[in-house]
Amino acid sequence: MNINKLKFPLVVKPSDRSAGRGVVKVNNTEELKIAYKNAKSLSNNGIVLVEEVLDGKQFSVETISENGMHIIVAITEEFFRQGKYEDDFLEVGHLIPARLNDKEKSAIQKETLKILDAFEIKFGACHIELKLDINGVKIIEIASRMGGWRNTLIRDAYGYNINEMLLNVSLNKKIKFKEQKNKFNAIVNFIFTKDDFEHYKWTRKKYPEFISDDFVNAKDDTKFFYASDLLCSNGFYYLKIPPRTDMKQFLPKGYK
């Protein structure tokens, strides 16, 4: 392949990693070479993916399949770092359920079912990442596992026990699932910066009843450094926001 003929920008990432490790947008051949070496060093199978940059907002879908029948458990709205390091695609927060109108939700659901059938998924969990814009849905990737942090978000939002559902599938037991309206808006925020930590402290002081759980390593004297992936966070915390409460103030900085 002649890399000089590639159209930039592009996204480079390892084929088999998680938590955003090694994922970066590149704008020229020199950046591509550096990103390729880094992604290859992180990949367990040595395979590096080079993809086009997709427009639109990013969402992910959690599914469970049983004998080839698929259940769409939840759709997550994903938030990414903005500003100087936005090309690293670092996730800074997740929201369940995603804020979608009926048409958008239907489009995502239809594409999700198509991709599960295309890959002949019969049993277990899948985590599908996608972009949505005015032109429709574009699939980024599919993984045969549940997305990180989703079990708690799904529990907080809907009351579903997705771990129990997956266990029942593995034991060949019938899944009992009835789609219902969310009871809460469930958020997980990650702590990468001093501002993130201050936002956590503000939330804990002013709205302690909204924090369903937290795992925070940061302290007032913590020195924050550049983070390249979710494993570099200084912790995270879950929020259960009542449906009629304005949740914009609880979202990651820069999002409404």
Protein language model regions, located:
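Active-site proximal loops enriched in glycine and acidic residues that flank catalytic Cys/His/Asp
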Residues: E141-S144, I241
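Short, flexible turn/loop "capping" segments at secondary-structure junctions
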Residues: P14-R17, D88-F89, A227-S233
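Active-site nucleotide/adenylate-binding loops and adjacent lid/helix of ATP-dependent enzymes
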Residues: M1-L49, L54-G56, E66-G68, L95-K110, ...
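Conserved protein kinase catalytic/activation segment
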Residues: N135-K138
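Residues at or immediately flanking beta-strands
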Residues: I47, H127-E129
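ATP-dependent carboxylate/phosphate-activation module, predominantly the ATP-grasp catalytic core
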Residues: E52-Q58, T63-I121, A125, L132, ...
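Structural signal for hydrophobic packing residues in well-ordered secondary-structure cores
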Residues: K40-S43, T112, L116-E120, K174, ...
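Peripheral (often C-terminal) accessory segments that flank ATP-dependent C-N-forming ligase machineries
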Residues: N2, N168-K256
